[in-house]
Structure formats: C-alpha cells, structure tokens
C-alpha cells in the first residue's frame, strides 16, 4: 500500500496544484491572452480601416485631379476664346481706324485740290485781266477783244 498511498498523495497534491493554478494563476493568464488577442484584433481592424481610408483618399484625389484638369481645360478654352475675341475686336478697330484715316486723308487731299484750283482760277483771272488790259491798250477794237475775253472766261 505504500505505492498506493504515494500515488494517492501525488494525486491529491496534483489536484491541489491544479485547483490553485485554476484559481490564482489561470485567470490572469487568460486575461492577458484575451487582452493581447483584443489588441491584435483592434490593430488588424485599424489597419483594415486605414487601408480602406487610403483607398478612399486615393479615389478622392483622383476625382479631384480629374475635376481640376477639366476646370483647367475649360479655363484654357475660355481664355483662347477671349483671346480670339480680343484679336478680332482689335482687328476690327484697326480696320475702322485705317478707314477713318484714309477717308480723312482723302478729304484733306480733296480740300487741298479745291483750294489749289481756286488759287489757280484766281491767278488765271488775274492773268486774263492783265492780258485784256494789254489787248485793250494795243487795240481798241471791242468786238475782237470781247470775243477773246469770252473765250477766256469760257475756258475758266
């Protein structure tokens, strides 16, 4: 029975050891393991959320970039249209100014031509009168002289 008493004593000691471990050692170990599992699960969930947030941020950045490019294209097209409009307005204005200057120059030329004709008529009239005076001085034949004067006046 010695052998049985030893086995029985060892079994009782083992049962007490297991009970002690289950009562005092096992709960803190399980709590530490559960805490660690929770931390790992939270870390994985956080990493997954960060990955999803990164994907959303990439998609948002891509959309914003597309919108910015579209807006830039619209602005460039508007600027090109405005440039063409300004060029057309400048060409039209320059053409109008050119037409105005040409018309003004032609008017000045015509006025100068009229003034020169008038001056020439005055000089011709003075010469005609001087010629008539000389003709009258040389001859007193009025019929011939009046015929000459009439021809001069008709030419003027």
UniProtKB/Swiss-Prot annotation:
GO terms for cellular component: plasma membrane; proton-transporting ATP synthase complex. This is ATP synthase subunit b. Belongs to the ATPase B chain family. Its main location: membrane. It is a single-pass membrane protein. InterPro entries: ATP_synth_B-like_membr_sf, ATP_synth_b/b'su_bac/chlpt, ATP_synth_F0_bsu_bac, ATP_synthase_B_chain. Keywords: ATP synthesis, Cell inner membrane, Cell membrane, CF(0), Hydrogen ion transport, Ion transport, Membrane, Transmembrane, Transmembrane helix, Transport. The keyword Membrane applies. The lineage of its organism: Bacteria, Pseudomonadati, Pseudomonadota, Gammaproteobacteria, Enterobacterales. The chain crosses the membrane at residues 11-31. The keyword S-adenosyl-L-methionine does not apply. F(1)F(0) ATP synthase produces ATP from ADP in the presence of a proton or sodium gradient. F-type ATPases consist of two structural domains, F(1) containing the extramembraneous catalytic core and F(0) containing the membrane proton channel, linked together by a central stalk and a peripheral stalk. During catalysis, ATP synthesis in the catalytic domain of F(1) is coupled via a rotary mechanism of the central stalk subunits to proton translocation. It comes from Salmonella arizonae (strain ATCC BAA-731 / CDC346-86 / RSK2980). One of its GO terms (molecular function) is proton-transporting ATP synthase activity, rotational mechanism. Coiled coil: none annotated. It is found in: Cell inner membrane. F-type ATPases have 2 components, F(1) - the catalytic core - and F(0) - the membrane proton channel. F(1) has five subunits: alpha(3), beta(3), gamma(1), delta(1), epsilon(1). F(0) has three main subunits: a(1), b(2) and c(10-14). The alpha and beta chains form an alternating ring which encloses part of the gamma chain. F(1) is attached to F(0) by a central stalk formed by the gamma and epsilon chains, while a peripheral stalk is formed by the delta and b chains.
């Amino acid at each position: 029975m010695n052998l049985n008493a030893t086995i029985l004593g060892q079994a009782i000691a083992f049962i007490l050891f297991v009970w002690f471990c289950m009562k005092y050692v096992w709960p803190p170990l399980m709590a530490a393991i559960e805490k660690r599992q929770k931390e790992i699960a939270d870390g994985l969930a956080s990493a997954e959320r960060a990955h999803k947030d990164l994907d959303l941020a990439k998609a948002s950045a891509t959309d914003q970039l597309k919108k910015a490019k579209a807006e830039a294209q619209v602005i460039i097209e508007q600027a090109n249209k405005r440039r063409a409009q300004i060029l057309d307005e400048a060409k039209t204005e320059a053409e109008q100014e050119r037409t105005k200057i040409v018309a003004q120059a032609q008017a000045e030329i015509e006025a100068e031509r009229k003034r020169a004709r008038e001056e020439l008529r005055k000089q011709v009239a003075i010469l005609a009168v001087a010629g008539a005076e000389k003709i009258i001085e040389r001859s007193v034949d009025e019929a011939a002289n009046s015929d000459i004067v009439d021809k001069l006046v008709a030419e003027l």
